[in-house]
Amino acid sequence: MSSSTPASHAPEPIWAVLGASGFIGSSLEEALTRAGVTVRFVKAPRLSARSSDASGILAEAAALRDVRQDLSGELAGVDVVINAAGLATPTGADSPELRGANALLPVVIADAADDAGARRFIHLSSAAVQGHRPLLDESPQVEPFSAYSRSKALGEAALAARAPGTCQVTSLRATSVQGASRQTTASLVRVASTPLSSVAGRGESPSPVSSVDALCAFVLAAGRYSGSVPPVILQPWEGATVASVLSAAGGRRPLHLPVWLCRAALRAGYLVSGLLGERLHGTLRRVEMMWFGQRQEPGWAEATGNVPAPRVHQVLEAARKRA
């Protein structure tokens, strides 16, 4: 007499998302759920950090044993941990809270993910850590230019300096992420719809303006990847130029300004901002990106065939239509 045994299925892997209430986190939750991933929401602890160097951040993280233990319990049974928490304040001033959210928290999460036996931890960093470098890449070279970008660079440095465990840690440098419901995108649409919409020269420079759709797809690809993922990966370029971004967002062709005039205006602006404690650095950087954009070097995504479908122009057009 033959007997059959029901096929056993391995349980679906669980992904934990910290910062799920924010713009990126909530978009990730929707994208992961659509992809069939079981998502666990984990509340990120609010931390403050006194230190402004990686060794100091590591020492502060080591002292937070209770926080680490509590977080590890919440991450039990999780395969992939994604940190979308933090303070997204490009124009904000330096503070213990900023360093706590963007530098100390990632280390505490990485330690807790190790304790919980997670396979991979993806920390959402920012391409802003490379500041005015002419070429964005996946190297450890950073040139932060503001309190926000310094705090994100500090987070990357602290993760790189911590003793590695069994959980693979990756900092994912998101570029200028846009979404139809994001306030930053609404501001871009407003500017692009006015005579202030302008580019330097012919406007053919690559723009790192990107879509939240592509970012979520990239996070999913990195999390599911069965091989090793580098310590730093860069969100891929979506093929936009400075002119095409403004045209999609504003529905009109931008004004073309002389390159020398744009550079002179930025030099003067940064000089004044420096005298004001970098108060205008964030705004000036947005103008600089609008005029000149920033090139990106192909990296892990291109090498492994994990480049998501570009959606930036569609996202900007959708934002314009709902404005």
Give residue ranges: language-model regions:
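N-terminal Rossmann NAD(P)H-binding glycine-rich loop of SDR-like oxidoreductase domains
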Residues: 15-35
